[in-house]
């Protein structure tokens, strides 16, 4: 996968993170339609590395006008099984916002990844970054479990496994 890029070049994950950052800077707030438009513009260019799921969502005709509806439709068409991690890599920038981190991370994730497991992972990582930047301390294990369970209880067992020092248990 990585061999398609020159050393030091960024991937689709960084491109999409920049779509989020550019929209926030331009609008001076989180405007989901603006972010969706940036995603669509990027996808209609040369979106090297774009995943199949993200491609499918962004290439539905009325995506920009109804991004949540389109994202949910593609997820439902998969039998509610698609839970890829594409939303996670790009929403980390949301953790740098001073307020509304959880809502913004959840909403931005849902622009392309509607599955609640995807949403929870984006919220957890964004909240972790926010906590480290603004309080210099990470979220507690209990806080992470609480966030996960608010979105999808299936995540709890993976949070439990993360306490183990052996990555093979995951």
Q: What is the predicted role of each segment?
A:
Residues 1-170:
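Structured, active/binding-site neighborhoods that engage oxygen-rich ligands
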């Amino acid at each position: 996968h990585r061999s398609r890029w020159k050393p030091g070049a960024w991937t689709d994950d960084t491109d999409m993170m920049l779509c989020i950052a550019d929209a926030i800077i331009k609008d001076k707030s989180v405007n989901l339609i603006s972010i969706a438009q940036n995603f669509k513009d990027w996808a209609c260019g040369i979106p090297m590395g774009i995943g199949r799921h993200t491609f499918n969502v962004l290439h539905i005709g009325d995506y920009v006008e109804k991004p949540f509806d389109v994202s949910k439709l593609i997820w439902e068409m998969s039998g509610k099984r698609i839970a890829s991690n594409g939303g996670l890599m790009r929403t980390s920038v949301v953790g740098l916002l001073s307020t509304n981190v959880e809502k913004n991370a959840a909403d931005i994730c849902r622009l392309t990844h509607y599955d609640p497991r995807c949403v929870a992972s984006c919220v957890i990582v964004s909240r972790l970054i926010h906590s480290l930047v603004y309080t210099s301390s990470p979220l507690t294990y209990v806080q992470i479990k609480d966030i996960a369970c608010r979105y999808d209880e299936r995540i709890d067992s993976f949070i439990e496994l993360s306490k183990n020092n052996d990555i093979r248990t995951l």
